[in-house]
Each structure stands twice: as structure tokens, then as C-alpha cells.
Amino acid sequence: MTIEEQDAQALDAYSHAVTGAAETVGPAVVRIDIDREGGRFSRSLFGGGLGSGFIFASDGQILTNAHVVSNARRIRVTLADGRVFDAGLVGAEPDADVAVLRIGADHLPVAELGRAPLKVGQLVIAVGNPYGLNWTVTAGVVSALGRELPGGPGRREMKNLIQTDTSINPGNSGGPLVDSLGRVVGITTAMMPMAQGLGFSIPLETVKAAIARINRRRESRPSPRRSPSGTARTLSGRDTARRRGSPHSGRPRSSHRRR
């Protein structure tokens, strides 16, 4: 076998890993649109008003970033099959930048959470909605582990982050970072402004600990009043599902243009 043939085989293996991972996790990835008091928030470091998330329980529970849904008046979730739901906020851990949402649907496709520890140089894939370009897939490697980001205006200090060169842009926040088998290894959370190839994700152990704390608080307080669909009534509007055109076209709706 020639060197050129070996290179072609390596590229094919890489391509198959990326496409396979995207096909595995894609059905569980969601788009999140936020209305805040005073209208739609259009600009923030993290692309507030538009974000990503993923279904981690088939009864409609969704993981995303706390900053994506902070101060939300209304949260709308678009599934990969085009259905749109109003969502309730189950709980949030701002220090970890993790939030759990729930929609009134069940028997949904679920993203598998990984178990193996990450290694520097490992292939990772991000799926999300940068700038409203729905279900965008980007690939890269784990550049470093245990990174810290200093706090600043409107954001908290963050520790123990995964650094990747996977392309991350406003709107990616809250989406899954997955391994070559499509298993979630982190939640995309931030990019370095004015830089390329510097993205950061929350590691899975931090996410799992945040979910456990949210569940403990949820179990220790009285149950919220629920709508007939099962979504907690923490939002204005009805918990409805509307069938729209497929989001896979990648074309952002003009009313959702933000950064």
C-alpha cells in the first residue's frame, strides 16, 4: 500500500467517525430560543437569546447552559424533527453553567452520556446552532483539560473546562460535545473572543454533579403546578407543540437573527 493510499484510508476513517457521531447524537440535539423581559435579547458574549441543548432523558428533560436561559420570560425548544415546544425550567446551577429544562413530550431520542475519561488529542465533535444555522457539526480535538476562564462583566469564573479547537460560535452554547461514538463528553459553554480555535466545554463530571444538585433541590421542595402536558408552569404562554418545516435546512429565521 502506498503512502497516498494510507493517507486516504486515514481520512476515510476520520470522516466516518465524524459522520457516525453526528448521526448518533443529532436527533437528540435541540435549538433553544429565549424571550426576555423587554423583548428578544440580541447580543451577549455567549449569544444570549439563542442557544443549543440536548435531550438526556426520554421524558423530555433537556440539558443546556444556565446562561442561555437566565432571566427567561419564555423558552421555546425546537426538536430535530421540527416540532416546537414551550419549555419549563426544572433548575439551574449558575456556578457550573448547567440548566435542566423539560418539555411536554416523551419517547424522545436521547443523547448517551459518556463514561470513559477524556484524553488530550482525542477527537471531539460539537453539534449546535451557531448564529441560528441549525444542527451545525464541527470537529476538532481536545486541546487541553482543566482550563480556567476568569470572570468578568456578566459572566462567572469557570474552572476545570475542556479546551478544544472545535469551532464554537454564538448559538453553540449548551450543545453537546461528543466523542467519536457520539457519546456526550461535555456541554459547549464559551469561546475566546477575537480568537480562533479556542473553545471551551463543561466536562461531564461537572454536568452530572450539577444534575444531582438540581434533583436534590427539586425533591426537597413542593411540586410546582403542572400543565396537562406535564411541563412545569414556570413560563407564560401555553405548553404547545407546533409542526414547522424541518430545521435541517440550516437557514436561520429572520426574526431569530442574533449573536
Task: Label the model's feature ranges.
Residues 1-235, 240-242, 254-258:
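Serine-dependent protease modules
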